[in-house]
Curated annotation (Swiss-Prot):
It comes from Homo sapiens (Human). Interacts with DAZ proteins. SMART domains: RING. This is E3 ubiquitin-protein ligase DZIP3. GO terms for molecular function: phosphatase binding; polyubiquitin modification-dependent protein binding; RNA binding; ubiquitin protein ligase activity; ubiquitin-protein transferase activity; zinc ion binding. Residues 10-38, 637-698, 1088-1145 are annotated as: Disordered.
Length: 1208
């Protein structure tokens, strides 16, 4: 397991004896000497000794992996308070109490709790503590709580293992400890008798061992080749043991049952209630009710419970047939589902009938010959139905014979392991041979001698020892100190030592197999004996819940333990019943047939005057009457107690051999021997007189010895009814009344003297044997002392070497720790720098991303605004054209109404209707195209990738339409041909097709008709310029003036309009909007009225109702429709006007100064400004000051072709 020598872990007999002698010497030392010894103890030896003590307390520590051992040593060297334990030992020795062992489980748990509290109180982080050390402490604490075995300990241990699992999941470097977590939980489940859960945990632990070459899971080799060498081998051993426990020690036989403990089978849970199936071989299989349903549906679907009658036993390896099935829902109430019964073979008086009379009339025969009546059951017989008193009897039989033997054997095995027992038996062979070296032909194992000294030099197995043999070995081998009053006297109530309790248990065993077996017992007697036996078993180490379980178990389950009872009693239970029946029908004492040699009647008649046996004597007078009368039964009070019937048998044989060699002995006494033995003899004589005065007690002692002999007899696998015991009660009562006394005073005195003589002789022989034994043991102890001295010297050398090596390793560890600490500090500094740089980069990236998102959103909004402005700009001109066409249609309609006979006017009306409809269709088409592109831009499409919007073609000429309506061929020159001028659409992006190289054409404000003189009077040109009075309202004119003159306030413009209205007779209905703008400009700046009129005509082009600019207020507007001779063919893209080209340059509407080519800036909407004027405006507003079109500066989106202005 660790690097220490193997001698530290192998239990050497010499070392064990030395430890016992040192403990005995410590008891004799005073408190001062003890304190001095504590001070003299070298501190270097403390860790080694403590490690050995911890290994003894926790069995799992002996085979832990190498990776855990250094942490255990660290705990024992650094955190274990050895001085506290020494102070407790010193205090106990000063108070006169018995010194406790060097280390107890309670003290180890206390030290582990203190170490864990120190770690938790320090509030360390995962980087500051040793995770492996902390996990090792948790594991040791959980295993120690599991070893202690209290209910609250199981809960706390489960919590500690859960904490281990969570810590390991957080720290992957400690993943090897996960195997220990599942291993500890498996030990916990097995301690709770939840073997299925424990098996699952062991398999999980085995799976956690991944790499077979990982030396972390290795185990240090030992001298014992049977021990595992790796942790994996250890887990495989635990798995095999757990699988065996599932088949043997559990109650529920369903493999998937998680509550298979015996204590759960009758609790008020979902597992309450059980089914019991019994086969012809007396095998009993149990299932929880819920588990039985699952098992039956899985293995035998569709079958009911009664169909299992006669099927093969469910127990593996059993060849019997199921003969009985019980169901238990409430403790004590059993429902029989099916059974196979043959009632004519019950052992009862009613069923025996004539066979019973024949049994009573049989003559005296050899006791080894059984009567001809057959008492054997068929393989499918029903179990017996017991009376109330035998219900109590069998409960006591189970708790004393089975439970008592198990607990005493457990104590005996701890104190005397098989190797040491074999050695002690060889040493004391001469002492034991006189008691046990004789043949017991009816014992299945060959008798006690074959048990103590098996053939082929095998180790003796204590599992085959009965209670009395264990007591005899404890007595002769001095395993425990003798009781206060010795082995031959009943211990007082104040003596609660182990030896006294074992002696009391054997006493109750004798009473049970004698008086209680014959007479039964009442409920009060049962409760009294049960209380005393329970107290004895509790002091010996049995759990209270196990005792209560035996008491609450139904009689049907208790009686099924007769297999084990046959082994512990030494003779099969059916044979005991048969021999008792055979004995009582012949009138022979029960003691003479239960394992002892029968005393021949004739031999006793011929040797009436000879010496009687020192232990017990039967004087039987045979008369003419066929029945046998008992004369008197006397038993020597100085005989060996009834803990072993084998001793009594051997003494009886020795005395009988002496009787055949001698006839009489002289009535002499040795004075020296008498003086030495006077107190002992007087005590025994008083006891003898009491027993002679009470014949009932003599009969009781005989029955005790008879019951002791039954322990080592043969064993069979059948069980018989106890009803025949009532027959024995009847026979015993009939025979007891016929006993008479036949001796006189002279015979009694002679027997008393002879008894004393043999008593003294036996004591002398006993003293000689004791002297030889003590001499031999003293010599052997001297040899062992020399061997121990050599071992101690070698161990001291190894300890010194180990201490030097440990100190060297500690220095190396300290240097490595410092190096690791420096590396951790450097790593921490670099990590902090990396984190700061990462934080700065993340913040920078976040800022740029937010800016990018904002600019992207702004660009998207700008593109949408751009398309909306282009759409509104294009629709503005088309709507204006539609209005002009409507006006022309209205005029032509009015003229046609006044001249109904003119076909030319009717054709003109039809042509203008067609033009209006065509313009309206083009308006709808253009609006649809722009809206589709706006939606695509909103969906994420780039404006540069969209196809350009195609402008609709110009409407047909009215003259062509008129010719079509009149049905005439086209005329080259026509009087009615109008000229339609369409404003230019400036191109600002690839999505709009426009002639960018041509100058901007003025908006068409109206269409004038030039009619010939014969048709009618000419219409004044000014009439075509007047707008409809209904649409000219005050607010609309004010808004348009505000757009044309942004530097003026609304109040100032309103005042100018009022002045103009007063000048024209309180009405502006006769003035057009261009005339109003011209008049207002004169009011604002008379000096610049002419230039302002030009700029107003330029500004008003964005409004649907604006009129074209006029060079002079008095000059009439130019008509849109001209004769063919005066104007060339009109195109939709517009044509340049030579007159307009000759006009002066328009002023800047911001500063009202004239524009020059040097500092001219033209916006996408074709408005012109000074560069120094428009740039600050665009940086603040982002729109054209005239038409409010959204405009972007080049530096906002550098490199984007659609954002480049002609000149800024």
């Amino acid at each position: 397991m660790d690097s220490l020598p193997d001698e530290f872990f192998v239990r050497h007999p010499a070392v064990e004896d030395q430890r016992k002698e040192e403990t005995e010497n410590k008891l004799e030392k005073s408190s001062g000497q003890l304190n001095k010894q504590e001070n003299d103890i070298p501190t270097d030896l403390v860790p080694v000794n403590l490690l050995l003590e911890v290994k003894k307390l926790l069995n799992a520590i002996n085979t832990l992996p190498k990776g855990v051992v250094p942490h255990i040593k660290k705990f024992l060297q650094e955190d274990f308070s050895f001085q506290t334990m020494q102070r407790e030992v010193a205090a106990n020795s000063q108070n006169g109490e018995e010194i406790v062992p060097a280390l107890t489980l309670r003290f180890l748990i206390t030290q582990l709790e203190a170490a864990l509290r120190n770690i938790q109180a320090g509030n360390y982080t995962a980087h500051q503590i040793n995770i492996g050390y902390y996990l090792t402490l948790l594991f040791l604490y959980g295993v120690a709580l599991t070893e202690r075995g209290k209910k609250e300990d199981y809960t706390e241990a489960e919590n500690k293992f859960l904490v281990m699992k969570m810590m390991i999941q957080e720290n992957e470097i400690c993943e090897n400890f996960m195997s220990l977590v599942y291993f500890g939980r498996g030990l916990l489940r097995c301690a709770q008798k939840r073997y299925n859960g424990g098996l699952l945990e062991f398999h999980k632990s085995l799976q956690e061992i991944g790499d077979k070459n990982d030396h972390w899971f290795d185990i240090d080799p030992t001298e014992d080749e049977d021990l595992p060498t790796t942790f994996k081998d250890l887990l495989n051993n635990f798995i095999k043991t757990t699988e065996s426990n599932i088949m043997k020690q559990t109650i529920c036989s369903y493999l998937d049952c998680e509550r298979s403990c015996e204590a759960d089978i009758l609790k008020n849970t979902s597992y309450k209630g059980f089914f019991q199936l019994m086969c012809s071989k007396s095998c009993c299989v149990y299932f929880h009710k819920i588990c039985w349903k699952k098992f039956k549906n899985l293995k035998y679907p569709g079958e009911n419970d009664q169909s299992f009658s006669g099927k093969k036993c469910l127990k593996e390896g059993c060849t019997g047939d199921m003969v009985r099935m019980l169901q238990c829902d409430v403790p004590g109430i059993v429902k029989i589902l099916f059974e196979v019964v043959r009632k004519d073979e019950y052992i009862t008086i009613e069923n025996l009938g004539a066979s019973y009379r024949k049994l009573i009339s049989l003559k005296i025969t050899d006791t080894d010959i059984r009567p001809k009546i057959s008492l054997k059951f068929n393989t499918k017989d029903e179990m017996p139905i017991f009376k109330l008193d035998y219900n109590y009897f069998y409960h006591l039989l189970h708790i004393i014979i089975i439970s008592g033997t198990d607990i005493v054997r457990q104590i005996f095995d701890e104190a005397m392991p098989p190797p040491l027992l074999k050695k002690e038996l060889l040493i004391h062979k001469n002492v034991l041979e006189s008691y046990y070296n004789h043949l017991w032909t009816n014992h299945p194992l060959g008798g006690s001698w074959h048990l103590l000294y098996p053939p082929n030099k095998e180790l003796p197995q204590s599992k085959q020892f009965d209670l009395c043999l264990l007591l005899a070995l404890i007595k002769h081998l001095n395993v425990f100190p003798a009781p206060k009053k010795g082995w031959n006297m009943e211990p007082p109530s104040s003596d609660i030592s182990k030896s006294a309790d074992i002696l009391r248990l054997c006493k109750y065993r004798d009473i049970l197999l004698s008086e209680i077996l014959m007479n039964g017992l009442t409920e009060s007697q049962f409760n009294s004996i049960w209380k005393k036996v329970s107290d004895i078993l509790l002091r010996l180490g049995m759990m209270q819940e196990d005792i209560d379980k035996v008491k609450e178990n139904p009689i049907e389950n208790i009686s099924l333990d007769y297999h084990q009872l046959s082994v512990y009693l030494g003779i099969p239970v059916p044979e005991i019943i048969q021999r008792m029946l055979s004995c009582y029908q012949q009138g022979i004492a029960l003691q003479s047939i239960t394992g002892s040699q029968r005393i021949e009647i004739e031999e006793l008649q011929n040797e009436e005057e000879e010496l009687s046996p020192p232990l017990m004597e039967y004087n039987i007078n045979v008369k003419s009457h066929p029945e046998i009368q008992f004369a008197e039964i006397n038993k020597d009070g100085t005989s060996i107690p009834s803990e072993s019937s084998t001793e009594s048998l051997k003494d009886l044989q020795e005395v009988k051999s002496k009787q055949r060699k001698k006839k009489k002995t002289k009535n002499k006494k040795n004075k020296d021997s008498k003086e030495d033995q006077v107190p002992y003899v007087v005590e025994k004589e008083e006891q003898l007189r009491k027993e002679q005065a009470n014949p009932h007690s003599v009969s009781r002692l005989i029955k005790d010895d008879a019951s002791d002999v039954q322990e080592d007899s043969a064993m069979e696998d059948k069980f018989y009814s106890l009803d025949e015991l009532h027959i024995l009660d009847m026979i015993e009562q009939g025979s007891a009344g016929k006993v008479t006394t036949d001796y006189g005073e002279t015979e009694k005195e002679r027997l008393a003297r002879q008894r004393q003589l043999y008593k003294l002789h036996y004591q002398c022989e006993d003293f000689k044997r004791q002297l030889r034994t003590v001499t031999f043991r003293w010599q052997e102890n001297q040899m062992q002392i020399k061997k121990k001295d050599k071992i101690i010297a070698s161990l001291n050398q190894q300890v010194a070497f180990g201490i030097n090596k440990v100190s060297k390793l500690q220095r190396q560890i300290h240097a490595k720790d410092n190096e690791i600490k420096n590396l951790k500090e450097q790593l921490s500094m670099k990590r902090s720098q990396w984190e700061m740089e990462k934080h700065n980069l993340e913040s920078t990236m976040k800022t740029y991303v937010s800016k990018l998102n904002a600019e992207t959103s702004r660009a998207l909004t700008a593109e949408v605004y751009f398309l909306q402005c282009r759409r509104d700009f294009g629709l503005l001109h088309l709507e204006q054209t539609e209005k002009e066409c409507l006006n022309q249609l209205a005029r032509v309609t009015h003229m046609a109404a006044s001249n109904l006979e003119s076909l030319q006017l009717k054709a003109a009306v039809d042509s203008w209707n067609a033009i209006v409809a065509d313009v309206r269709n083009k308006i709808a088409f253009l609006r649809t195209q722009y809206n589709e592109q706006i939606n695509k831009v909103k969906q994420g499409f780039a404006l540069s990738t969209l196809p350009p919007v195609q402008l609709p073609p110009p409407p047909p000429s009215p003259e062509i339409l008129m010719q079509q309506f009149l049905g005439r061929p086209l005329v080259k020159e026509s009087f009615f041909r109008p000229i339609l001028t369409v404003p230019q659409m400036p191109a600002v992006c690839p999505g709009v097709v426009s002639a960018t190289g041509q100058p901007r054409a003025p908006l068409m404000t109206g269409i004038a008709w030039a009619l010939p003189a014969p048709v009618g009077d000419a219409v004044p040109p000014s009439a075509g310029l007047r707008s409809d009075p209904s649409i000219m309202n005050w607010e609309r004119i004010t808004d348009r003036l505000k757009t044309a003159f942004p530097q003026q306030t609304r109040k100032e413009l309103t005042d100018f309009l009022r002045k103009l209205k007063d000048a024209y007779g309180k009405s502006l209905s006769e003035l057009t909007f261009d005339e109003i703008v011209c008049k207002i400009s004169q009011f604002i700046d008379p000096k610049k009225s002419q230039s302002q009129g030009k700029s107003v005509s330029n500004v008003n082009c964005v409004s649907p109702s604006h009129s074209p600019s006029q060079p002079d207020a008095a000059q009439p507007p130019k008509p849109a429709w001209r004769p063919l001779t005066s104007q060339g063919p009109a195109t939709w893209e517009g044509a340049s006007n030579p007159d307009e080209e000759e006009e002066e340059e328009e002023p800047c509407v911001i500063c009202h100064e004239n524009l020059s080519p040097e500092n001219l800036s033209v916006l996408p909407c074709a408005h012109k400004f000074h560069a120094q004027c428009i740039r600050p405006w665009l940086m603040q507003q982002g729109t054209c000051p005239t038409c409010r079109l959204h405009v972007l500066l080049p530096e906002e989106f550098p490199g984007h072709p659609s954002r480049q202005l002609p000149k800024i």
